[in-house]
Amino acid sequence: MSLATLTVLGFSLSADAFAAALGKGAGARRPDLLEAFRVGAYFGAFEAAAPLIGWALGLTFAARIAAFDHWVAFTLLAGVGGHMVIAALRAPKAETAEASKARQKRALSPLRLALAALATSIDATAVGIGLAVTEVNILMACALIGAITTVVAAGGVLLGRGAGPLLGRKAEVLGGLALIGIGLKILIEHLSA
């Protein structure tokens, strides 16, 4: 598989991570460049590991994985997104600065980032299964996919950061709805295939 093909694959797989990171950036309290790359690294690491796992599983387990991967992705994304929406809607209208800071810090908690990254990378496992039957340097492919996703997701956080102050709490609601929408998209694509 050519470097150009792998690059296109990397950008394609990073689209869901970008959307999720956009919501994370909008719901967070002014994330800086370092924090944006920390978030990007979560998404990049999961996106790099998923094809490797899929490749290792190979074609033997393809039918078993395909039978439920979309449900796992949907459940994780809908759960994280739903929690973001509920938390934003339940937050008091006149929130103290401390309460606002704590809520926004939770948006970038390691657990929430890991769940969102896991959910957006499940499709990459199926891609890895497909890569098992092609001539590809799987380590190079995974490294490239991870690097692209890291940069794209970090960009999503920074773009979301700009939208966050303009939208206020609505940004967190929109971010949560975006995650739910990604989950629904994955579910519908797999159920209609």
UniProtKB/Swiss-Prot annotation:
It is a multi-pass membrane protein. InterPro entries: Mntp/YtaF, Put_MntP. Pfam families: Mntp. The chain crosses the membrane at residues 3-23, 39-59, 65-85, 113-133, 138-158, 173-193. It is found in: Cell inner membrane. One of its GO terms (cellular component) is plasma membrane. Keywords: Cell inner membrane, Cell membrane, Ion transport, Manganese, Membrane, Transmembrane, Transmembrane helix, Transport. GO terms for molecular function: manganese ion transmembrane transporter activity. PANTHER family: MANGANESE EFFLUX PUMP MNTP-RELATED. Belongs to the MntP (TC 9.B.29) family. Probably functions as a manganese efflux pump. This is Putative manganese efflux pump MntP. It comes from Rhodospirillum rubrum (strain ATCC 11170 / ATH 1.1.1 / DSM 467 / LMG 4362 / NCIMB 8255 / S1). The gene is mntP.
